[in-house]
A protein has these predicted regions:
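Extracytoplasmic thiol/disulfide redox context detector
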Residues: 1-85, 131, 135, 154-167, ...
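Cysteine-centric redox/oxidoreductase cores and disulfide-bonded domains
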Residues: 79-172, 177-181, 186-190, 197-200
Length: 200
């Protein structure tokens, strides 16, 4: 049922004739604007490889290259399914100061809020579980409900996916755009380090 839900959702996205756009929302960035290396990560919050990167590789990347001014890092949503869409909605409804902390928590506890049993209520139960994480960051039940119905945030998330496909031919997550060059799949710190040193 989950595979059918994902396939139907993706088909519906690409049935849209025009790109969505948002003037006020954007991917979240960290690092110096003057950094010689720019890394954009297209990721999915339900992707296990994205969680692995976030939990295992990103902390060292941040301490050795982002905090030292070598890398500017940007996160862009690439929703793979309806659960992903709701998770990204929650993330972008959080205060900007809480964005990276909530992002980290969702990846750390990914297996807890993706509720696969019973199989006929995956979306409903996972969406409810996400709301519990929102409360930890001051997002009330009413705020969360409003967030899920926020068209501007929905449009932004969908546009990022469509633009990622059209501009970079992205078909899987994570995908990294490093100074304009595309690298698909999860990357270890050692792999990224080699690329960064070549481009810096």
């Amino acid at each position: 049922l989950l595979k059918i839900l994902i396939l139907t959702w993706i088909i519906n996205i690409f049935a849209i004739s025009a790109l969505y756009s948002s003037e006020t929302l954007k991917g979240m960035q960290i690092g110096s604007e003057d950094a010689p290396v720019s890394i954009i990560e297209y990721r999915s919050l339900t992707c296990s490889h994205c969680a692995e990167f976030s939990n295992e590789t990103y902390p060292q990347l941040k301490s050795e290259f982002i905090d030292t001014g070598v890398v500017k890092f940007e996160l862009r949503p690439f929703a793979l399914n309806a659960i992903d869409l709701n998770a990204f909605k929650l993330l972008h409804c959080a205060d900007e100061a809480d964005f990276f902390a909530l992002d980290k928590l969702l990846f750390n506890e990914q297996k807890k809020w993706i509720v696969t049993n019973p199989s006929d209520k995956v979306l409903e139960n996972s969406t409810k579980a996400l709301g519990d994480y929102g409360i930890l960051f001051g997002i009330s039940e009413d705020d969360y409900a409003e967030c899920l119905n926020n068209e501007e945030i929905t449009d932004f998330i969908l546009s990022e996916r469509i633009n990622g496909v059209e501009n970079f031919d992205i078909s899987s997550t994570p995908t990294f755009i490093i100074n304009g060059e595309i690298f698909s799949g999860n990357k270890s710190f050692e792999e990224l380090e080699k690329i960064i040193l070549k481009k810096s």
